[in-house]
Amino acid sequence: EAKGAFGDAAVFLERYAPRARHVEVQVLGDSHGTVLHLGDRDCSLQRNHQKLIEEAPAADLPEALRDDMLSAAVRLAQSIGYRSAGTVEYLYDPASGEYYFLEMNTRLQVEHPVTEAITGIDLVEWQLRIARGETLALTQSDVQFDGHAIEVRIAAENPAENFRPETGRITLWAPPAGVRLDSGVAAGSVVGHHYDSMLAKLIVHAPDRAGAIRQAVAAIDAFAVGGVGLNLSYQRALLTHADFQAFRHHTSGLPDMFPEGWAQPTPDARDTGLAVMALHLHLAPAGASPWESLGSWRLTAPAGRPGAASYWATSADEPIRMSDVPGALAAVLPDGQNIEAEAPALTGDRLSGRIDGVPFSRVAHIERAGHHWRVHL
């Protein structure tokens, strides 16, 4: 059959490893015979063979096996006189302790920033310098590894609806501060259906894996986007899942992690209360002073925000009741929980105030959606 279809009777057999981990090695080779490895990465969290979250180094690998993988990658690149940045990919079967060659990608991978984070080496720069004929100004002993890095792929899709693509105009793009974000979009960008759904890569770096996970979760929580839905909540669920944190995940492990599928989580009480406060301030600003009015006024005119108002969340049976109290706003949720913010203020897309005496300031982007309002925190 192979002879008839391809003119070659050779058949290439691959080992079937249903619960494998995807481990890859970054290499650099110049035109003067030098080849180095820059450590390994783990890319085992995948959906339909598409990577979701990557990290470096690959955690929980036996050190002897890691050394063998790294050495094999260097020998492979040396044997073909490889020149450039490249990635040697393996499948590792924890059950047998064996690993198998998968492929070599002769380019920079999407996930190369995690290697840059732990080595401090600019891979794009060295790819260009090697192409110009320069000699690698590094030895293998110069390559040192510092801490742990995680990359989260941010895509315009709805995981709760079978990863349906999201399209539209981005009305708010407020990424978190203090982390690396590789992206080519901004507020006003139009997300269409003609291209890949990935809009950005979020990269964090910490002294250890647990710290990197915490940083990634905090960055996702601080990321505010409007106009187009993203997979942020899904990626957060992966990062906080016990299987990922204990390194029990594998390339086909998503059904094990979410056996009944994944549903968009319900906002917690604090976020719900703050969202309604932001909308309340947006719809009924406090400044009703006659001295700030350009027209005539009378004593019976409305004097600022109403003392109380009710708001219904989508599909809710009971309203969220908002009331002005001296120097504060209080939101009473349908379940009776009370969220009170002192000195609340909405300035542009930022809501600020104090809760239990602790100051807060966060993005609160409000947009009209037909007969509804959307608040993006």
Residue ranges and their predicted role:
Residues 27-29, 40, 92, 106, ...:
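Flexible glycine-/small-residue-rich
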Residues 30-71, 108-123:
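ATP-dependent carboxylate/phosphate-activation module, predominantly the ATP-grasp catalytic core
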Residues 113-340, 344:
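Catalytic cores of soluble metabolic enzymes centered on carboxylation/carboxyl-transfer
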Residues 12-17, 22-29, 81-109:
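Conserved metal-phosphate-binding beta-hairpin within the catalytic cores
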Residues 161, 249-250, 356-377:
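Structured, non-catalytic alpha/beta "coupling" segments that mediate domain-domain communication
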Residues 1-6, 10-16, 55-92, 219:
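A long amphipathic alpha-helix within ATP-dependent nucleotide-binding catalytic cores
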Residues 23, 34-37, 98-103, 180, ...:
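Protein kinase-like catalytic core scaffold
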